[in-house]
């Protein structure tokens, strides 16, 4: 097999593998879309916010690059900007490193509720992040 064919196979495998482990969550209204990267065991990251995306756009959003902006920044590791949450644990440590436990979506009347459960990797500290979107106005 030529080097070019091997590179194509490797690139295709990496794309497939990357999309298998990523879990995007889309919170949409009739006019807008918010896309979050929410892999279980990973960090909640902001992917896109803007005009409503089509199904094709949503399927291809992973091709736009790797999300690197935390959707819920916490005080401690890797948060040079403003934090959404800071705590002081019983031992005095203020570091948080939140990972996703689960993502649930439910519908209630004319709204869709997305609940993302986060937990600290070291301490028994949990946070639920909720997104509410109106389906029909």
List the predicted regions and their residue ranges.
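Residues that act as N-cap/strand-start positions at coil-to-secondary-structure junctions
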Residues: 21, 30, 123-125
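Acidic-aromatic substrate-binding/catalytic surfaces of carbohydrate-active enzymes
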Residues: 24-117
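Low-complexity, acidic Ser/Thr/Pro/Gly-rich terminal tails and inter-domain linkers that flank the onset
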Residues: 121-131
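Short, low-complexity Ser/Thr-rich regulatory SLiMs
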Residues: 38, 131-133
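Bacterial N-terminal signal peptides
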Residues: 11-19
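Conserved small/polar residues in nucleotide/adenosyl-binding loops
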Residues: 135-137
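Bacterial N-terminal signal peptides that target proteins for export
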Residues: 1-11
């Amino acid at each position: 097999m030529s080097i070019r064919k091997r590179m194509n196979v490797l690139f295709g495998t990496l794309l497939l593998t990357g999309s298998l482990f990523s879990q995007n969550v889309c919170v949409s209204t009739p006019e807008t879309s918010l896309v979050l990267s929410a892999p279980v065991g990973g960090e909640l990251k902001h992917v896109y916010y803007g005009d409503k995306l089509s199904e094709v756009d949503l399927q291809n959003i992973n091709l736009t690059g790797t999300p690197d902006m935390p959707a819920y920044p916490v005080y401690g590791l890797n948060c040079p900007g403003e934090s959404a949450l800071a705590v002081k644990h019983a031992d005095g440590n203020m570091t948080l490193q939140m990972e996703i436990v689960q993502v649930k979506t439910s519908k209630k009347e004319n709204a869709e509720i997305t609940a993302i459960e986060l937990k600290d990797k070291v301490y028994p500290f949990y946070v639920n992040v909720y997104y509410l979107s109106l389906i029909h106005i």
